Regions:
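Short polar catalytic/cofactor-binding loops
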Residues: 41-46
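Short glycine-rich phosphate-binding loop at a beta-alpha junction
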Residues: 80-87
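Residue-level detector of conserved, well-ordered beta-strand and adjacent loop positions
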Residues: 39-40, 87, 118
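Acyl-thioester C-C bond-transforming condensing/cleaving domain
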Residues: 8-14, 18-36, 47-80, 95-97, ...
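Glycine-rich phosphate-binding loops at beta-strand->alpha-helix junctions
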Residues: 88-94
Length: 204
């Protein structure tokens, strides 16, 4: 079945940001003892920023909940988890301390290593890729990946006040464009490439 021009364009963009191995059906349609698999997916409830019953919930407590539930649902011992990686963008230190604290709150041993990654708008996905790559290269056998953010406790505008930025940022188009909010960026991308919401939903 042929795809619409917009979906073809989305497929092209996908190839720019994903591994060729991920797109090769030779690797995805057959099973192998070397496959890296995701055995579960767990998330906490969500609420809008500064609203709802979770607006005062600490990120480390939310991570702890996910870690404990992961062990419980899959009948795993904490000591079998060799790596925990969480993505984060807004928190101080990119969530390093919160993830480490959550590890101990959930009764994981100190031998389980912890790392946080900061990649705007896809930090959680980057964490999943990092754990998968460690498994694929035989660095670890099992790990947990995720993402955490509290828009109620950490403002997107922290540190972006014009008076806090160097003048050189406003003299460089690429650097200046980094200040464009993601909502406007998505609108600009859709307009530039003629993408419609229906096509994006179908592709997703």
């Amino acid at each position: 079945k042929s795809q619409s021009p917009n979906l073809n364009r989305l497929a092209l963009i996908r190839r720019h940001i994903t591994s060729n191995i991920c797109l090769n059906t030779k690797y995805t349609s057959t099973r192998s003892d070397d496959d890296v698999v995701i055995i579960d997916a767990i998330r906490t409830p969500m609420c809008k920023a500064n609203r709802g019953s979770l607006k005062d919930a600490n990120p480390e407590c939310m991570i702890e909940t996910v870690l404990r539930e992961t062990l419980k649902r899959n009948k795993l011992e904490a000591k079998t988890i060799q790596e925990i990686i969480f993505g984060n963008v807004m928190m101080t230190g990119a969530g390093l301390y919160q993830t480490r604290m959550a590890q101990f709150l959930a009764d994981f041993p100190c031998e389980t290593t912890v790392m946080t990654v900061n990649r705007l708008c896809s930090s959680g996905l980057q964490a999943v890729m990092d754990v998968a790559n460690q498994i694929a290269t035989n660095q670890i056998d099992i790990g947990i990946a995720g993402g955490v953010e509290s828009m109620s406790q950490y403002s997107m505008n922290d540190g972006l006040a014009p008076e806090k930025l160097s003048d050189s940022i406003f003299e460089n188009e690429g650097a200046r464009n980094c200040l464009i909010p993601m909502g406007l960026t998505s609108e600009n991308v859709c307009e530039k490439y003629g993408l419609k919401r229906e096509d994006l939903d179908q592709f997703a």
